[in-house]
């Protein structure tokens, strides 16, 4: 469910879920983790760009076709483990990583983007963390935003559940650069080339030190987030939202 190609020393990983909004299904998660591992192990690759594809979303979050089925405790626990493992897979890449965000980055897609060293955003894209208004727990998102952007910003984003356009994302410092959609991938690759030119040893060891507490934070939130999501899914408050999104496919 991904395409992999190189632009000189930059590996471009393009998400290719059949749905243009790239919801994170189990298969897409595995494909992304495997692609990141290949890029990390390839000495010819000096930086990595992850992109949702032209006229597609970066990721609209969890795949509701799968998430709607979560009810048993063990299934919810396994799903949270998958989510945390995906995020840690990005943080463990020892090369520069760039997220090129177009369309929507919703929920899990928003959180996934925050794992990257740099984020570039199309001027028409939107970040959204809407979980709470739909009856879905947001403890993982809260932990991530609290770490990356501070407690007050985290509170605003997860409690207001609003769509954040490019100017608001810049205000919150969620992104490093905003460009036109047609220029997004080229701009991300250009930034990746800049960072790929840094001496490898200094970058690798600095990044490892920088990301270590972030990885530890995600590990710490596993059990607490399993409890939060069990309570939320077992209340079944989210089922109406899943039905509205999926329609006849529900």
Curated annotation (Swiss-Prot):
The answer to whether keyword Transferase applies is yes
Phosphoprotein as a keyword?
Answer: no
Query: Which residues are listed for malonyl-CoA binding in this entry?
Result: 60-64
This protein's pathway: Antibiotic biosynthesis; carbapenem biosynthesis
A GO term, aspect molecular function: transferase activity
Share what the entry says about its subunit structure, partners included: Homotrimer.
Summary of the function given for this chain in its UniProt record: Catalyzes the formation of (2S,5S)-carboxymethylproline (t-CMP) from malonyl-CoA and (S)-1-pyrroline-5-carboxylate, the first step in the biosynthesis of (5R)-carbapen-2-em-3-carboxylate, a beta-lactam antibiotic of the carbapenem class. Also catalyzes the independent decarboxylation of malonyl-CoA and methylmalonyl-CoA and the hydrolysis of CoA esters such as acetyl-CoA and propionyl-CoA. Catalyzes the reaction with a C2 epimeric mixture of methylmalonyl-CoA to give a 55:45 mixture of (6R)- and (6S)-epimers of 6-methyl-t-CMP, under standard incubation conditions.
Would you tell me the protein name for this molecule?
Answer: Carboxymethylproline synthase
- Originating species: Pectobacterium carotovorum subsp. carotovorum
